Amino acid sequence: MSELSTMAIKAGGQLAPDFMLWIGSKDVTPNLRERMVSLSLTDNRGFEADTLSITLDDSDGLLQLPQRGTVVSLFLGWVGQLHNKGDYTVDQVSHSGAPDVLTITARSVDFRGELNKARDVSYHDATLGSIVTQIAQRCGLILQMAEGFAGIKIDHIDQTHETDPSFVTRLAKRYGAAAIIKAGRLLFLRPGSGELASGKAIPTVLLTRQQGDKHNFMVADRTSYKGVQAKWLSTQEAKTHIFQMQRKAKAPNAAAVTHPDAKSPPKQAYDNEGEYTAGQKESLLVLPEVFDSKEAAKQAAEAKWSEIQRGVVHFTFQLATGRADLYPETPVQVSGFKTVIDASAWIISKVTHNLSVKDGFTTTLELEIDISDVEYEEIN
C-alpha cells in the first residue's frame, strides 16, 4: 500500500498534496488514504459532465464494490488548503488485477433520470429565457442565465424526441452560449467572457512558464476565417439580405517577456502579431441556413464567429504544482513563452487535476483565446 502524504512535490516545495472524500455524511478518507493509487478530476465546460476517477489498491481483497448511484464529495488541494470540488454520482465500477485495483468513476451530473428522457415539445412565440426556464424546472435545477440571453425572441422551435441536455445544448450553440450543470444549477453563460453567470468578473490568474512541466501551442489555420456571413429573408421585400461579421484589424502588440532560453525570431515575425490568430483576408464562412429576420441572422453569425475564434488556437499547460482553485472560464495571463503567446489573453476551457503517488499533484489546463475584448464590425 502507499502513503500519499509522503509524496514529493516536483517543484521542490515542502507542501504535501491532500484530499478528502465523503460519502453522504461520512468521511471515508482515513479508510482510503493508504490505498490511493491515483485520483483524476476533469472539470469541463458545457454539458459534458465533470468526471472523477479514483483508483484504489485492493491487493488484500478487503475493499467492497460501491453501489452505482452513490454520491461522493471531493475536497482537493494541499494540507491545510483543501478546495471543495463538488459532488459526483458513481456510475461505473471496475475491478482488475493482478495486482488487484478498484477503479471508481463518478460524474457531476446524474443522467439516469429525467435528464435522459427524450421529449417532444413545441415552443411558439417564446423567448430564450422562458424556454430554458422550463427546461431547468423540469429537471429540478436552479437557472442562472448570463445577461443578454433571456430576452432573445424565438418565433418557433421544436424539441423532437430529444433529451433536455441535447436540446439546451443546441440552443446554447445557436445563440453563442454554453449550458452547464454544476451543483444543482443550470448555468447559461457566454463562453470566453471571463465572467460568472451572475455577470461578476472572474479575477485574472498570472502563470509563468517556470510553474509548468509541459506546454503545447498550436494554431490551426484550416479553421481560421476572416468573418461569417448569414442570410436572412425579408418577407416585405421578398428579398434575401446578407449580414456579415468580421474582426477589425488590430494594432501590433507590444513585446512581451520571453523565456531566457528562447531564441529571438527575426523582427518581421513580430510585425503582425496583433493579427496572428485572425483568418485569411478572403476566407469567409457562409452559414447554409436562411434566417427569417436580420436579428436571427445576426445572432447566428455572432455565435458561429465566437465559436470559430475560440477554436483557432489551442494551448495546453501542465502545472507542476497542482492548482485546485482553478476552474473553466478563469482568465489567464502567461509569461515566459513565445511573444505571441505571452501577448495574448487566455481563458481556461478545461481543467484536469491528477493526484498520484508517482507524480504528485499536477494540474493540466486547456486554454483558448479570450475574445471578450476583440472588436468586430458588421457589414450589411
Where are these regions (language model features)?
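Amphipathic, non-transmembrane alpha-helical segments in extracytoplasmic/periplasmic proteins
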Residues: 53-54, 106, 120-144, 159-182, ...
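Short glycine/serine/proline-enriched coil/turn segments at secondary-structure junctions
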Residues: 81-82, 96-98, 180, 187, ...
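Short, compositionally biased
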Residues: 89-96, 121, 193, 345-357
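Sec-dependent N-terminal signal peptides of Gram-negative outer-membrane/periplasmic proteins
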Residues: 58-60, 78, 82, 93, ...
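Short beta-strand-centered interaction patches in the first periplasmic/extracellular domains
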Residues: 2-8, 101-110, 147-222
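An acidic/polar, Gly/Ser/Thr-rich interaction patch typically located in mid-to-C-terminal regions
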Residues: 35, 39-67, 211-380
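Assembly/oligomerization scaffold segments
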Residues: 1-113
